[in-house]
């Protein structure tokens, strides 16, 4: 093998190793956002739920600040249970990456029967949370709070 070929091969291997350390983008969260919009009939933008209280958004800890934050805590717990399912326990199959089939008809959410066990579980996690968000009051004072002091 020529030295130039070895350099190209080495460059490809290093690139692949670097790409392996880049986390995949959560695909399912887009669907979850659409479910939220369906359930609340578009009354509140999805981004308002991304940094609310102690549990809505990335991570979560402490005591939920209100009922809406409890919806997010329950959703986080549901995703945790999904990750324990054998059907969801393979690469890129967990709750953040697995997409599912559902329908939205005039605010009514239905997870379709063609979902496998993992997708059905995740769909129901998202459906339950979206319905909870729609029926629970939103307190602007709990958006973008200091989680280090309040949670």
UniProtKB/Swiss-Prot annotation:
EC number: 3.1.1.4
Catalyzed reactions: a 1,2-diacyl-sn-glycero-3-phosphocholine + H2O = a 1-acyl-sn-glycero-3-phosphocholine + a fatty acid + H(+)
UniProt superkingdom: Eukaryota
Subcellular location(s) per record: Secreted
Record protein name field: Acidic phospholipase A2 1
Functional summary from the UniProt entry: PLA2 catalyzes the calcium-dependent hydrolysis of the 2-acyl groups in 3-sn-phosphoglycerides.
Lineage: Eukaryota, Metazoa, Chordata, Craniata, Vertebrata
GO molecular function: calcium ion binding; calcium-dependent phospholipase A2 activity; phospholipid binding; signaling receptor binding; toxin activity
UniProt organism field: Tropidechis carinatus
